[in-house]
């Protein structure tokens, strides 16, 4: 049974409802005086006990403690690792912002530098301290349902529960002058705030939980507008079921979480209404002021507060630029490329009137501030061995959508990814780590916002490895020349950084942007310089490798695409105060959605499974003709395989290199087979509004002839009898890695050390078959017969079945010999037919 969509969110908010505490009734001493002397004595005794219960004075409580003034004053006993936090009466009931980052990870399950988001808050969580007697409640206030102050329904909205994150008891007496009270903040901060224990509970063979007795406060710093708190959390298990290669002892590890508590931004920032035709991250709430509105949601674009210093000029510097700091962990040799990737976005801002909207600064080696400090937006290098990825979250004001902090983290291993084996050929432990990573990501998807998920870097590194080996196969005996290597890596880093910076500027993915250029345009230097390789850096763009003998353009996006300029214009263009209303001006910008170069689709349009209906809304595709593009890529794979013995089999080198190169030749198959299969039963989906210039209908079936072309491509290049052919000599040279490593991969989980070639091919062939025989796709094919124009013969389910049957069983029909790959394929085909007949859901 499918859970309602709201259930995961309800589970993650930690919704403990605070009991309503009613004030005690006031006693009228004249009318309700004690009736007896004994009763009077009881009252006197109670008064005396109350005086004694006040405890030590404020000064006595913090005697010997180091005072650290700031937003929330801290008192610290370094020897005892004891901390008091002071709250003034004015701070009770006020909403603050709490940003949480993991600044130290274990390197296997979780990395360092991660931004932690909780529930509906995303990455900028509102918090509030409420006092009830001598108890302080640490709350996540419910700001997601609102109404105007003078609306009667406001009272009902305010009765919706907040979430309680922790509680603490007041220590000693208030400060005699400020009225501030002291509390031990350990129960508030020294807790499993990231719900690591919950994540592990959903995984097999992993059983770590927090040990509060071994957890403690780390570094504490304070500033007038923000308080920074580090907590060291220890996770332990008495029975580790797997060896963690990044730990000296798998029975325990420590994470450091950094809390950055700050005031809400105080500015004249104006929220900007979002539009579904352009892809931005959103801050949203439901407004109950009027029940007549057709949609209760109010959606704001997430964006930085950017204003012209000189509004009268067409182009002006901003009052306050967006500043990114390059953390001192970034290798020196990559810093220029990282800087270039950040500053790429200034081109888009200049078109709408901002000069140098973005500024890049270098963190000094001796800097005394931490990148987790909410005052600094950073780009950081972090270590998680064997993983190649990058993410770019930002933090926003939950009331307005104003972005006030962003921290991009990039895996140090992503450059080395080209030297790894392809995923299907990786050692069992490496595959297991990938599976664990996928399980963690899936579980965290229940806790956070799936729209903020980004796996671009992992796939980009696979693309980079494929391109790297192809270019080395085409080069002379010495491989790529050093300048070519540096140019390749520079372009790669620029695109990766520009993509993640785009996220921190508020832009979502655009998985249609890669479809706007022809083959000639992809490799035309002028087009590359003017419009980039694709329509947006926010797509998952593959490496742009030209077919053998064809002129070569840029390998990666080193310039913004046409969509990027449009998305920045919508979010940041200063609006004319004297012109049309804001809504009309924004609608005019968004109404360009039907222009071919502005085509847009995002994560919810690009599901990998059969929920994804649009063959243009895919990852790792390129060119206006995807089928032709993948046909070229398969020819490039054949080229790589044919040249690999000559180019990579060098005297004195190890045979493991050949196995690695052989594996990367499968990359076009793993990325392309599923994408081409989407044309079969596909529907182009558009977000145009009624009345847009050249507007399109929401759904347009893929032409039947195009579906037949896609199926023909699959049957020839993936399912056909001549699809996969290698010499025995080559297969016998594909040696596995025999060096010892931290994972004992040459022992643990090893079943076969030779290359499982039939399994590799079958894995590729299963991709289209799994899609073609999925009940949802078959139902869609049936429905599509009603969607085609009367003058077009539709592509039908019967045609799909007949084409696959005649292709897969051609030898049996003709009485010809059947090779081993085809026998495997025929067994797989029978399995799908059996499933349809015997176990098809009602």
Predicted regions and their residues:
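Short pre-active-site segment immediately N-terminal to the catalytic Zn-binding motif
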Residues: 330-334, 479-497
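Auxiliary tRNA-acceptor-end handling modules of aminoacyl-tRNA synthetases
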Residues: 27-330, 348, 352, 357, ...
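Conserved catalytic/binding loops enriched for acidic/polar residues
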Residues: 476, 483-488, 513-842
């Amino acid at each position: 049974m499918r859970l309602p969509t709201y259930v995961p969110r309800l589970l993650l908010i930690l919704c403990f409802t605070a009991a309503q505490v009613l004030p005690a009734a006031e006693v009228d001493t004249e009318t309700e005086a004690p009736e007896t002397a004994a009763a009077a004595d009881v009252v006197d005794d109670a008064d005396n006990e109350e005086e004694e219960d006040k405890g030590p004075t404020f000064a006595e409580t913090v005697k010997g403690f180091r005072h650290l003034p700031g937003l929330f004053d801290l008192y610290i006993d370094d020897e005892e690792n004891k901390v008091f936090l002071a709250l003034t009466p004015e701070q009770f009931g006020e909403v603050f912002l709490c940003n949480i980052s993991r600044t130290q990870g274990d390197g296997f399950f979780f990395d360092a530098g991660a931004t932690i988001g909780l529930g509906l808050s995303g990455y900028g969580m509102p918090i509030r301290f409420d006092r009830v007697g001598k108890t302080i409640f640490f709350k996540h206030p419910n700001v997601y349902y609102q109404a105007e102050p003078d609306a009667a329904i406001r009272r009902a909205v305010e009765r919706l529960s907040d979430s309680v994150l922790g509680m603490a008891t007041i220590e000693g007496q208030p400060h005699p002058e400020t009225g501030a009270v002291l509390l031990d903040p350990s129960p508030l901060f020294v807790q499993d705030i990231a719900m690591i224990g919950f994540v592990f509970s959903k995984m097999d063979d992993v059983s770590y939980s927090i040990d509060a007795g071994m957890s403690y406060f780390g570094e504490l710093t304070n500033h007038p507008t923000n308080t920074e708190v580090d907590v060291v959390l220890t996770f332990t298990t008495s029975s580790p079921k797997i060896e963690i290669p990044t730990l000296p002892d798998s029975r325990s590890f420590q994470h450091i979480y950094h809390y950055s508590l700050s005031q809400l931004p105080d500015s004249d920032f104006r929220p900007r209404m979002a539009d579904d035709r352009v892809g931005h991250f959103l801050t949203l709430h439901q407004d109950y002021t009027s029940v007549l509105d057709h949609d209760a949601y109010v959606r704001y674009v997430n964006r930085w507060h950017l204003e012209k210093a000189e509004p009268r000029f067409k182009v002006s510097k901003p009052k306050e630029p967006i500043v990114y700091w390059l953390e001192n962990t970034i290798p020196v040799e990559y810093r220029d490329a990282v800087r270039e990737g950040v500053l790429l976005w200034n081109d888009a801002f200049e078109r709408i009137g901002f000069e140098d909207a973005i500024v890049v600064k270098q963190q000094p080696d001796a800097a005394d501030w931490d990148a987790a400090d909410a005052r600094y937006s950073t780009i950081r290098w972090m270590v998680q061995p064997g993983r190649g990825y990058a993410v770019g979250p930002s933090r926003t004001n939950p009331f307005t959508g104003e972005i006030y902090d962003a921290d991009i983290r990039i895996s140090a291993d992503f450059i080395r990814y080209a030297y790894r084996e392809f995923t299907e050929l990786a050692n069992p432990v490496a595959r297991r780590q990938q599976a664990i990573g996928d399980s963690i990501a899936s579980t965290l998807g229940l806790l956070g916002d799936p729209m903020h998920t980004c796996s671009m870097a992992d796939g980009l590194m696979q693309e980079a490895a494929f391109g790297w080996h192809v270019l080395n196969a085409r080069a002379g005996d010495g491989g790529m020349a050093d300048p070519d290597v540096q140019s390749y890596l520079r372009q790669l880093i620029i695109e990766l950084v520009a993509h993640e910076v785009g996220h921190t500027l508020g832009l979502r993915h655009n998985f249609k942007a890669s479809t706007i250029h022809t083959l000639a345009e992809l490799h035309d230097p002028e087009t590359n310089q003017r419009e980039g390789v694709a329509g947006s850096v926010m797509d998952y763009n593959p490496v742009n490798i030209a077919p053998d003998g064809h002129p070569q353009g840029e390998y990666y996006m080193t310039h913004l695409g046409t969509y990027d300029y449009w998305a920045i214009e919508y979010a940041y263009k200063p609006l004319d105060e004297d012109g049309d209303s804001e809504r009309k001006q924004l609608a005019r910008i968004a109404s360009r959605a039907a222009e071919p170069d502005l085509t847009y689709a995002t994560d919810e349009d690009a599901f990998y499974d059969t929920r994804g209906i649009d063959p243009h809304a895919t990852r790792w595709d390129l060119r206006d003709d995807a089928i032709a593009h993948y046909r070229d890529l398969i020819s490039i794979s054949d080229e790589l395989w044919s040249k690999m013995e000559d180019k990579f089999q060098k005297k004195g080198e190890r045979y493991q290199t050949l196995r690695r190169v052989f594996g990367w030749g499968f990359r076009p198959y793993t990325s392309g087979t599923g994408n081409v299969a989407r044309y079969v039963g596909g529907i182009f989906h558009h977000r145009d509004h009624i009345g847009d210039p050249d507007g399109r209908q929401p759904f347009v079936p893929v032409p039947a002839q195009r579906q037949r072309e896609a199926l023909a491509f699959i049957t020839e290049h993936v399912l056909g009898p001549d699809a996969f052919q290698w010499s025995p000599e080559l297969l016998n040279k594909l040696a596995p890695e025999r060096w010892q490593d931290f994972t004992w991969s040459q022992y643990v989980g090893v079943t076969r050390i030779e290359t499982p070639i039939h399994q590799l091919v079958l894995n590729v062939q299963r991709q289209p078959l799994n899609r073609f025989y999925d009940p949802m796709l078959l139902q869609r094919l049936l429905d599509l017969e009603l969607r085609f124009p009367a003058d077009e013969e539709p592509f039908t389910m019967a045609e799909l079945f007949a084409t696959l049957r005649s292709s897969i069983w051609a030898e049996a029909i003709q009485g010809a010999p059947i090779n081993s790959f085809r026998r495997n394929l025929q067994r797989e085909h029978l399995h799908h037919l059996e499933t349809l007949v015997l176990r098809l859901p009602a």
